[in-house]
């Protein structure tokens, strides 16, 4: 599991940062990539990575400001032109379907795959399959903005092979039945319960990705015990009043939330173009004074999220 940042800037593309987009790469786990936001030129950024557009089968849109969605029509068209045929699901605020379909209709773009739209109607569970569960909650921005909490389901415990060998239970297909937790009758007549030979489940990982927001209690709920918290940092520590007036956050506010939520790492993004060079480093060092595992991410940074 990895996060790859395709755009880390705020508002408009800059010389050093493109507008917002981050990929959650689940290639080893489920051979797919999820995209969070798709700002202008996201498809150009993808060309500079090893991400294959056809592997992206889910896109989560935090809110409908242009720096988070203007790249969608182009990406969707290119995915089709490059042979993408698998269905793609777009999750987002009410209006995302209208934006996408209007763009495709007016440009007379034809796609080779089906798009499924899930417009967010309420907070809570947004998506669930056998591997993951995604919760969504509303944030505090000038328009509807959301945060997403991706929870990987727990991994089954390992088969306790040494314990089986101690009881002279021979290896073979029977181990597969035992690992499934089944009750098994051995050739010698012994009956064993597979549950007794399975270790404790390994907790799944949690990734929290937030849209633009002022501080709100929902952030801590989404970020609780997260292995990675992706939080906007449009402003620095001296600009709290500006952040509030413009419905954004500072690096210090993000760091305090990460600490309160017991997150493992804080990844600061949505960085204003005013913060370059030393000023960008200062954003990070100020955040680290409160939450030591803070990082101001740059375009194309890749963050590994190992199992606990």
Swiss-Prot record:
Is Nucleotide-binding one of the keywords?
A: no
Instruction: Provide the family line.
Output: Belongs to the RNase Z family.
Q: Which domain of life is it from?
A: Bacteria
Task: Provide the species name.
Answer: Pediococcus pentosaceus (strain ATCC 25745 / CCUG 21536 / LMG 10740 / 183-1w)
Quote the cofactor binding remark.
Answer: Binds 2 Zn(2+) ions.
Write down the top EC class of this protein.
Answer: hydrolase
UniProt name for this protein: Ribonuclease Z
Mind telling me which NCBIfam families this protein's record contains?
PRK00055.1-3 (NF000801), RNase_Z (TIGR02651)
What keywords are annotated for this sequence in UniProt? Answer: Endonuclease, Hydrolase, Metal-binding, Nuclease, tRNA processing, Zinc
Assembly and interactions? Homodimer.
Please state the gene responsible for encoding this protein. Answer: rnz
The Enzyme Commission number assigned here is 3.1.26.11
This enzyme catalyses:
Endonucleolytic cleavage of RNA, removing extra 3' nucleotides from tRNA precursor, generating 3' termini of tRNAs. A 3'-hydroxy group is left at the tRNA terminus and a 5'-phosphoryl group is left at the trailer molecule
What does this protein's UniProt record list under function? Zinc phosphodiesterase, which displays some tRNA 3'-processing endonuclease activity. Probably involved in tRNA maturation, by removing a 3'-trailer from precursor tRNA.
The residues responsible for catalysis, as annotated, are: 67
For molecular function, the Gene Ontology terms on record are: 3'-tRNA processing endoribonuclease activity; zinc ion binding
């Amino acid at each position: 599991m990895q996060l790859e940042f395709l755009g880390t800037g705020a508002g408009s593309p800059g010389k050093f940062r493109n507008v917002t987009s981050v990929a959650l790469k689940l290639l080893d786990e489920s051979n797919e990539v999820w995209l969070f936001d798709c700002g202008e030129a996201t498809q150009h950024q993808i060309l500079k990575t090893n991400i294959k557009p056809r592997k992206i089968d889910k896109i989560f849109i935090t809110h409908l400001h242009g720096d988070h969605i203007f790249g969608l029509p182009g990406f969707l068209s290119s995915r089709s032109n490059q042979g993408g045929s698998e269905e793609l699901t777009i999750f987002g605020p009410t209006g995302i379907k209208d934006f996408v379909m209007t763009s495709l209709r007016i440009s007379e773009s034809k796609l080779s795959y089906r798009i499924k739209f899930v417009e967010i109607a309420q907070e809570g569970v947004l998506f669930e399959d056998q591997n993951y569960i995604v919760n969504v909650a509303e944030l505090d921005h000038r328009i509807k903005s959301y945060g997403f909490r991706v929870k990987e389901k727990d991994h089954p415990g390992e088969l306790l092979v040494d314990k089986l060998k101690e009881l002279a239970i021979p290896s073979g297909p029977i181990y597969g039945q035992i690992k499934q937790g089944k009750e098994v009758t051995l050739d010698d007549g012994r009956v064993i319960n597979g549950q007794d030979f399975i270790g404790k489940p390994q907790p799944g990982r949690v990734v929290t990705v937030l849209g633009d927001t002022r501080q709100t209690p929902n952030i801590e709920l989404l970020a609780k015990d997260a292995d990675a918290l992706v939080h906007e940092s449009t402003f620095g520590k001296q600009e709290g009043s500006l952040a509030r007036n413009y419905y954004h956050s500072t690096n210090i506010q993000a760091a305090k939330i990460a600490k309160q939520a017991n997150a493992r790492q804080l990844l600061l993004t949505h960085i204003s173009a005013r913060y370059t060079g030393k000023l960008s480093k200062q954003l990070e060092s100020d955040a680290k004074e409160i939450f030591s595992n803070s990082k101001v991410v740059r375009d194309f940074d890749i963050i590994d999220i190992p199992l606990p």
